[in-house]
């Protein structure tokens, strides 16, 4: 068994202890001061982002959230990655209970914090980290805590993420395949970074203990099995499944089989790092006239098939900080000047595929401008959009089956959405 945590500390931004829980008796509260000293020493180091530090026989693993440090100290040869993952789950649980994890919420709810730390870790080993399950027997009401005498079924059940006895009048499953496109284009029009981060997000409202089976399109399945495919295979990376997925079954026949938690959760996340063609391309031509007037010609072109349509398109165009009196014309949509952003915001509700639209704008500048004025740093063009019924990767859900011993019929709903993530073009 991997080494255990000796203690867990919650520290403020200055390194002062807010709460700490000793699990094994082999460290003291002084460990917090030694950790923070190491943290300060690391600030000037090129590896300062390393979440693990070692000092005098003690390993420190930490994460920072808002103005709080969560730190585990251990004297054993522990699995640092596992304990760091546990700290992130602690953050999720605290946010579930207190909405915001920050110094004030910990001080106001320190009794609940101690109770949660006792349930989430036992003798230094992680235990229950599902917020829904913990909330069944650790309840808060105006900073009061109630502890039920009998633990919920989910704690003693093999399926710890789902309680027994769940009932719904209408049994439904909603599955959203959401992909975020990240693109960075430099001033020469070259793509310097592109990837797609995807997630299969589920919301389940099902009675009992249902068994779900999900099948993806052949290009994903066959690629995973190393067999030949028709057309281009989908090369997904960094695939992560929710703990409910039977990994042994997936390794055997690539079937995603699981008993789902109740409510919303991420069934699977993945990344696609192959070169992605920009779905919306923006070109900008800027002309300055005797330093008193600037004209902009912007062309926005959709580079996806005509059968798809982008919605809620928003193109943020940087303008000089001292610009004023804008005059704007667009061939589609509307544009408004946002002086607080030093930008012109072009909004298009519906942008069909394989189309191009233009925006012309004219701004006035102060009539007197210093000849030696330092050129200001150019902000990038930022683009936001959503494309329903479309995925960049081509991933598709072939089937979603719900089987429950009572034999009820459940309605599965599947939709696809591609969205802009960090989508920037440094063309201006």
Swiss-Prot record:
Disruption of the gene: reported phenotype: Short pollen tube growth and failure to exit the style. Compromised cytokinesis due to the mislocalization of the KNOLLE syntaxin. Full spectrum of growth defects, suggestive of compromised auxin signaling and of defective RLK signaling. Cell morphogenesis was also disturbed. Impaired pollen function and growth retardation phenotype.
Domain MHD: 170-426
Tissue expression per record: Ubiquitous.
GO CC terms: AP-1 adaptor complex; early endosome membrane; nucleus; trans-Golgi network; trans-Golgi network transport vesicle membrane
Coiled coil: none
Function: Subunit of clathrin-associated adaptor protein complex 1 that plays a role in protein sorting at the trans-Golgi network and early endosomes (TGN/EE). The AP complexes mediate the recruitment of clathrin to membranes and the recognition of sorting signals within the cytosolic tails of transmembrane cargo molecules. Required for KNOLLE localization at the cell plate to mediate cytokinesis. Functions redundantly with AP1M1 in multiple post-Golgi trafficking pathways leading from the TGN to the vacuole, the plasma membrane, and the cell-division plane.
Membrane topology: Peripheral membrane protein
Entry keyword annotation includes Iron: no
Name of the protein in question: AP-1 complex subunit mu-2
Domain of life: Eukaryota
Subcellular localization: Golgi apparatus, trans-Golgi network membrane; Early endosome membrane; Cytoplasmic vesicle, Clathrin-coated vesicle membrane
Biological processes, Gene Ontology terms: clathrin-coated vesicle cargo loading, AP-1-mediated; intracellular protein transport; post-Golgi vesicle-mediated transport; vacuolar transport
Family: Belongs to the adaptor complexes medium subunit family.
Transmembrane portions of the chain: none
KW Aminoacyl-tRNA synthetase (keyword) present: no
Subunit text: Adaptor protein complex 1 (AP-1) is a heterotetramer composed of two large adaptins (gamma-type subunit and beta-type subunit), a medium adaptin (mu-type subunit) and a small adaptin (sigma-type subunit).
Main location: Golgi
Gene3D superfamilies: 3.30.450.60, Mu homology domain, subdomain B (2.60.40.1170)
Keywords of the record: Cytoplasmic vesicle, Endosome, Golgi apparatus, Membrane, Protein transport, Transport
């Amino acid at each position: 068994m991997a080494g255990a945590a000796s203690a867990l500390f919650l520290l403020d931004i200055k390194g002062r202890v807010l709460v700490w829980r000793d699990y094994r008796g082999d460290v003291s509260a002084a460990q917090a001061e030694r950790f923070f000293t190491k943290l300060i020493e690391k600030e000037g180091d090129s590896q300062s982002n390393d979440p693990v530090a070692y000092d005098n026989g003690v390993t420190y693993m930490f994460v920072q959230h808002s103005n709080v440090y969560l730190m585990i100290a251990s004297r054993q040869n522990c699995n640092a990655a596992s304990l760091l993952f546990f700290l992130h789950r602690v953050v999720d649980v605290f946010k579930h209970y207190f909405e915001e994890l920050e110094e004030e919420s910990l001080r106001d709810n320190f009794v609940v914090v101690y109770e949660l730390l006792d349930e989430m870790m036992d003798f230094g080993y992680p235990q229950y980290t599902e917020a829904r399950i913990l909330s069944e027997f650790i309840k808060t009401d105006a900073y009061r805590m109630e502890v039920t005498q009998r633990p919920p079924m989910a704690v003693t059940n093999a399926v710890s993420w789902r309680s027994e006895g769940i009932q719904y009048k209408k049994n439904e499953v909603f599955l959203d395949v959401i992909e975020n496109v990240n693109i960075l284009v430099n001033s020469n029009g070259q793509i310097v970074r592109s990837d797609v981060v995807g997630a299969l997000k589920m919301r389940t409202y099902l009675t009992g203990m249902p068994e779900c089976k999900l099948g993806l399109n052949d290009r994903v399945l066959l690629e995973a099995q190393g067999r030949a495919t028709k057309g281009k295979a989908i090369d997904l990376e960094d695939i992560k499944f929710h703990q409910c997925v039977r990994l042994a079954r997936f390794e055997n026949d690539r079937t995603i089989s699981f008993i789902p938690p109740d409510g919303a959760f991420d069934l699977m996340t993945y990344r696609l790092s192959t070169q992605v063609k920009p779905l919306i391309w923006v070109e900008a031509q800027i002309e300055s006239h005797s330093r008193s007037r600037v004209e902009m010609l912007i062309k926005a072109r959709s580079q996806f098939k005509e059968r798809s349509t982008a919605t809620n398109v928003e193109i943020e165009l940087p303008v000089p900080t001292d610009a004023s009196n804008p005059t704007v014309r667009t061939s589609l949509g509307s544009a408004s000047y946002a002086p607080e952003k030093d930008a012109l915001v072009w909004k298009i509700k519906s942008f069909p595929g394989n189309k191009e639209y233009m925006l012309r704008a004219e701004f006035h500048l102060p009539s007197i401008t210093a000849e030696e004025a330092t050129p200001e740093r150019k902000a990038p063009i930022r683009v936001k959009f959503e494309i329903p019924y479309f995925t960049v990767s081509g991933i598709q859900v072939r089937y979603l089956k719900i089987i429950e011993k009572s034999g009820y019929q459940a309605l599965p709903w599947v939709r696809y959405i591609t969205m802009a993530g960090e989508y920037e073009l440094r063309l201006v």
